[in-house]
Amino acid sequence: MSAGKRSAAGSARSDTATSTVDLHASLLPLAFLVGTWRGEGVGGYEGLDGFHYGQEITFAADGRPALGYVSHTWWADEPRDGREPGSPLATETGFWRVQPGEDGKPVVEVMLAHPFGIAEIYVGTVTGTRIDLDHNVLIRTATARDVTRSVRLYGLVEGCDLAYAIDMEAEGKPMQSHLSARLHRVSD
């Protein structure tokens, strides 16, 4: 990837193999995420039967120093527990941004909100096309489930698919695998 012209707004054109979008210069380490991704994943947790889900994630750049982020998931298993294939499961919205770290390496900050009463801030690192995130702050409403910590790993696999894994500590149970998926790019 190469950074091209800079505009007066402080953004750079990111010339990637899959997209050319107005991308703020601070977001160049995340340029590989920009676009819409779609695929399938598996989920589970202690006390919860395993399940399959479909997902679409969009990372959008508009020239400002944060990527907009929206994720939608839907049931992709046989009918169970009142769920039918295609019925909505979860939504996340938020922003991803990059700040300079004390050691000069980029620090990724992710702010997410969920309709079930949780807002999260993750802080982590980006190394090439791998992003490691750990909870920095988690805020819950009085009626939200008792999630206490989460870690996420995102990265490109086999050159072009976006894969991730989310581990979670909740309801007094230890940190364990919760969700993982592999998504392919469907648009820039």
Swiss-Prot record:
It is an enzyme of class 5 (isomerase). The keyword Transcription regulation does not apply. Its EC number is 5.99.-.-. A motif (GXWXGXG) lies at residues 35-41. Keywords: Heme, Iron, Isomerase, Metal-binding. This is Peroxynitrite isomerase. InterPro entries: Calycin, Nb(III)_bact/plant, Nitrobindin, THAP4-like_heme-bd. Gene3D superfamilies: 2.40.128.20. CDD domains: lipocalin_heme-bd-THAP4-like (cd07828). Forms a 10-stranded antiparallel beta-barrel structure able to accommodate a hydrophobic ligand in its interior. In fact, this fold hosts the heme group, which is located in a wide surface cleft. GO terms for molecular function: heme binding; metal ion binding; peroxynitrite isomerase activity.
